[in-house]
A protein has these predicted regions:
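Extracytoplasmic soluble-region selector
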Residues: 1-36
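Beta-strand-connecting loop/turn residues
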Residues: 3, 54, 143-145
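Extracytoplasmic/periplasmic beta-strand context in beta-sandwich domains
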Residues: 3, 27, 47, 77-79, ...
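Short loop/turn segments at connectors of secondary-structure elements within structured domains
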Residues: 23-25, 40, 158-162
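A broad, low-specificity signal marking well-ordered, structured residues that form hydrophobic/aromatic
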Residues: 27, 44, 164
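Local sequence-structure signature of Cys/Sec-based thiol-disulfide redox active-site neighborhoods
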Residues: 35-75
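Short, conserved sequence motifs used for protein processing/export or organelle targeting and
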Residues: 66, 72-182
Length: 182
């Protein structure tokens, strides 16, 4: 019940989500207890609040490409606002983080990526160095129009208040982009 699920034991759990009047299909979640590695490789995420109408937003995209040239441990996601790629999740994130201007990018949800982003690549890269005591792995299988995910977490310490956010992204969308920088 409620908007979260906490497994208190190992086993299989049948769950579904509902938001009146919609109800999802039921899925099965397997919870198992395995030994975690002694350390996990740190990763980072850049959440880019953007839109095709935003003429200054290519600056952040360029910054992301510079980060990707330096490391494969930083991932990015575009949360589109005000264009055909906008969805309710992008709006929920925008509202939760109080985004009012574009572009805005967050690194690991803990800090706004400093302007000008292409000159502050180290801010993102440095968040993805070293080891962590919490880890995550995701495997996926695409079968026609159905995607199956295997999500595993590992904890080498007790951590409270953790949340797991999973994005399923579509890549390679071609659209016209306003650009005031070139």
């Amino acid at each position: 019940n409620g908007s979260s699920f906490l497994a208190e034991s190992v086993g299989s759990f049948n769950i579904k989500a509902s938001l009146t009047p919609q109800i999802s299909n039921e899925i099965i979640i397997q919870v198992s207890n395995v030994d975690a590695p002694s350390a996990f490789t740190k990763k980072a995420i850049i959440e880019d609040y953007t839109g095709t109408w935003c003429g200054w937003c290519p600056r952040v995209s360029y910054g992301i490409s510079l980060v990707e040239e330096q490391t494969d441990k930083v991932f990015s996601v575009g949360a589109h606002i005000g264009d055909f790629m906008e969805n309710s999740y992008s709006n929920s994130l925008k509202d939760a983080f109080g985004v009012t201007g574009y572009p805005t990018a967050y690194v690991n949800r803990s800090a706004v990526w400093a302007y000008p982003e292409p000159n502050n690549v180290a801010q993102a890269v440095n968040q993805a160095t070293g080891v962590a005591n919490v880890g995550l792995s995701v495997g996926s299988i695409l079968d026609g129009s159905t995607i199956k995910l295997l999500v595993s977490t590992g904890f080498n310490e007790n951590v409270s208040g953790t949340k797991l956010v999973i994005f399923i992204l579509e890549d390679g969308i071609i659209a016209s982009q306003s650009n005031y920088t070139s």
